[in-house]
């Protein structure tokens, strides 16, 4: 599971998911990547499940880059607790993803195999995605 070693503040405001990604929206490290088409909070569990799905196929022949990191804490209250008494405890960590963000990149596989691997990995994600290549430029 991914989570920060330490943060300046443990608990954070929720914020809003508006606009599109102006950074991290092109394939930089690998040849092919998964690009988000919707805004979402990706949990560390979802990122890990997707990483495992890709690793199953890539093994030693290729390389994986995870372009998102869950650095935002999400708090939850106990199920039957009364209102007030402060903010709840940190429950899990999320990465804020805007439309256009490249989530994962791979290299070292054929184009056909890469598409197959990334398509199967995208089923682990709770959003619509598209597979992009370095040449396509988008």
Curated annotation (Swiss-Prot):
The keyword Protease is annotated on this UniProt entry: no
Pfam families, sorted: Ribosomal_L16
SUPFAM superfamilies assigned to the protein according to its UniProt record, in alphabetical order: Ribosomal protein L16p/L10e (SSF54686)
Record's keyword terms, sorted: Chloroplast, Plastid, Ribonucleoprotein, Ribosomal protein
GO biological process terms held by the UniProt record: mitochondrial translation
Subcellular location: Plastid, Chloroplast
Main subcellular location of this protein, as a coarse class: plastid
Domain of life: Eukaryota
GO molecular function terms attached to this record: rRNA binding; structural constituent of ribosome
Database matches in InterPro entries: Ribosomal_uL16 (IPR047873), Ribosomal_uL16_bact-type (IPR000114), Ribosomal_uL16_CS (IPR020798), Ribosomal_uL16_dom (IPR016180), Ribosomal_uL16_sf (IPR036920)
GO cellular component: chloroplast; mitochondrial large ribosomal subunit
Subunit structure: Part of the 50S ribosomal subunit.
Family: Belongs to the universal ribosomal protein uL16 family.
Protein name: Large ribosomal subunit protein uL16c
The species this protein was found in: Emiliania huxleyi
Organism placement in taxonomy: Eukaryota, Haptista, Haptophyta, Prymnesiophyceae, Isochrysidales
Gene name as annotated: rpl16
